[in-house]
């Protein structure tokens, strides 16, 4: 199955378009876990085990593992190998010249064996091609990110009046989606941008961070991001789920929070 087919099959099976971001901050983890690579692994593995039937994907952020050096990389490898069912999106935001991109793509798809990766389009199509040619894997292109500084570049207007983020979306649709394995990252903190991107790309997967701690509104986001037939939107939540409790019952608390979010997403889909 292709990445898109895997996501949709998982979403149907789990009745969920929730994606849990695995962004483990050691100082916020349960106090009984060590603040090292092994603690991060144990924390994320427990979250995955507790919520695997409630999500359409997991998204580990590579930076939180790289921060521990070789031990962190090993922890990430082992975490991806767990594969409790939902696909794994490696949040790496890679983007570099051809030969470097080739190495990044091998690391993501052949070494770590992630199902998808986030990529940065700033260097253009030749920096994305090494990832895109892995036709069974997914590539989520940064389009309109959830951080406040996204306005600095992504909202710049081109000569024809389009914002840069919309040009990226249209380029992804027309030039980079030759294998049907391309998606877009669009932040929940920018509902107008989500609406514009969805209108331009009605059949592409959207990965939507920014709900919860970053302030994105769930109902507004679902209305803007959901496609007509199948939703094709992966609502990513991290801190709200990960740090629902700092005690020994943290995994159960994460499950309760994930269940609430999954049901809220489904209710918003029904109400649109």
From Swiss-Prot:
This is Orotidine 5'-phosphate decarboxylase. The active site is at 93 (proton donor). Belongs to the OMP decarboxylase family. Type 2 subfamily. The keyword Lyase applies. Pfam families: OMPdecase. Signal peptide: none annotated. It catalyses: orotidine 5'-phosphate + H(+) = UMP + CO2. Its EC number is 4.1.1.23. Keywords: Decarboxylase, Lyase, Pyrimidine biosynthesis. The keyword Aminoacyl-tRNA synthetase does not apply. GO terms for molecular function: orotidine-5'-phosphate decarboxylase activity. It comes from the Bacteria. PROSITE patterns: OMPDECASE (PS00156). Transmembrane segments: none annotated. InterPro entries: Aldolase_TIM (IPR013785), OMPdecase_AS (IPR018089), OMPdecase_type-2 (IPR011995), OMPdeCOase_dom (IPR001754), RibuloseP-bd_barrel (IPR011060). The lineage of its organism: Bacteria, Bacillati, Chloroflexota, Chloroflexia, Chloroflexales. It is an enzyme of class 4 (lyase). Pathway: Pyrimidine metabolism; UMP biosynthesis via de novo pathway; UMP from orotate: step 2/2. GO terms for biological process: 'de novo' pyrimidine nucleobase biosynthetic process; 'de novo' UMP biosynthetic process. SUPFAM superfamilies: Ribulose-phoshate binding barrel.
């Amino acid at each position: 199955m292709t990445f898109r087919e895997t996501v949709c099959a998982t979403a149907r099976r789990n009745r969920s378009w929730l994606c849990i971001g695995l962004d483990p901050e050691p100082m916020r983890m349960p106090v009984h876990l060590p603040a090292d690579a092994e603690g991060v692994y144990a924390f994320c593995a427990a979250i995955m085990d507790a919520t695997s039937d409630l999500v359409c994907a997991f998204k580990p952020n590579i930076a939180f593992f790289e921060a521990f050096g070789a031990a962190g990389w090993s922890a990430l490898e082992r975490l991806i190998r767990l594969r409790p069912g939902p696909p794994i999106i490696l949040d790496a935001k890679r983007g570099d010249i051809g030969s470097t991109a080739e190495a990044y793509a091998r690391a993501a798809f052949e070494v770590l064996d992630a199902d998808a990766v986030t990529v940065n389009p700033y260097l253009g199509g030749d920096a994305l091609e090494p990832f895109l040619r892995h036709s069974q894997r997914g590539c989520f292109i940064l389009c309109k990110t959830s951080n406040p500084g996204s306005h600095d570049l992504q909202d710049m207007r081109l000569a024809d009046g389009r914002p840069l983020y919309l040009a990226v979306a249209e380029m992804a649709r027309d030039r980079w989606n030759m294998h049907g394995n391309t998606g877009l990252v669009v932040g929940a903190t920018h509902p107008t941008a989500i609406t514009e991107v969805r209108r331009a790309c009605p059949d592409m997967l959207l990965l939507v961070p920014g709900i919860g701690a970053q302030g994105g509104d769930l109902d507004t986001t679902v209305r803007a991001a959901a496609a007509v037939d199948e939703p094709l939107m992966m609502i990513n939540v991290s801190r709200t789920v990960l740090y629902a409790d700092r005690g020994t019952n943290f995994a159960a608390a994460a499950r309760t929070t994930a269940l609430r979010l999954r049901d809220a997403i489904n209710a918003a889909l029904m109400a649109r």
